[in-house]
Design a protein with these regions (language model features):
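Intrinsically disordered, low-complexity proline-rich regions
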Residues: 1-10, 26
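Conserved active-site segments centered on acidic
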Residues: 8-15, 32-122, 187-198
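Phosphate-binding/catalytic loops
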Residues: 11, 20, 119, 125, ...
């Protein structure tokens, strides 16, 4: 996976203006010497059983429905180990799973995993749900020299935190906010010329 990020960074540094005008080259799903370059996104929350898996599967559904699935590698993780026992993560919290299912989205097989320092090099975007997540992400990752760390609603019209439905019980509101953030993130990527919208 690292080769994808390395090649993409080399490509961007080259800044070939003529090529940037060609849609088959502009999109992130380009071929450079036989390597397919994908944008790698990691969504992060406290336990990886509610908000971040909702974001993972909502965003997967969103890009797949737009025919963009092959341009992305998408996953999610936790800043804590509270939902991980003896190395095995808990599945998505049932109310979160039901909320996704209401919208025709499956999260089957997903289990909580913890964010690792090495994820900084593996992923292009590490996206938290609230300011506390960001602080804990930086505690695990260290510094953020490449400005990869952000919050999901940074990409939406209204910024702020996505409330934890574990405490609020409002999984419908969390779903709405995650969709809003994911749509904004996709628009942001399109604006940067990192993807080709079909």
């Amino acid at each position: 996976m690292q080769i994808y990020g390395d090649l993409r960074r080399l490509w961007e540094k080259a800044k070939i203006k003529e090529s940037a005008k060609k849609p088959e080259i502009t999109g992130l799903c380009r071929l450079i010497k036989g390597y397919k370059i994908m944008i790698k996104v990691l969504f992060i929350c406290h336990g990886n059983i509610c908000r971040s898996p909702m974001a993972e599967f909502i965003f997967k559904d969103m890009v797949n429905n737009r025919g963009l699935g092959d341009q992305f590698y998408i996953a999610s993780a936790a800043t804590s180990t509270e939902e991980i026992w003896n190395g095995i993560g808990n599945p998505v919290y049932p109310p979160a799973k039901r909320e996704l299912a209401k919208h025709g989205i499956s999260c089957e097989g997903k289990r909580a995993v913890q964010l690792k320092k090495s994820d900084y090099d593996k992923y292009d975007y590490l996206i938290g749900m609230e300011e506390r997540n960001r602080r804990n992400m930086l505690r695990i990752l260290g510094k953020d020299p490449e400005k990869k760390v952000s919050l999901l609603l940074d990409y939406a019209d209204e910024h702020g935190d996505i409330a934890d439905p574990w405490y609020t019980g409002n999984f419908d509101i969390t779903y709405r906010d995650v969709v809003r953030g994911c749509e904004g993130f996709l628009t942001y990527l399109e604006g940067k010329g990192q993807i080709i919208m079909n």
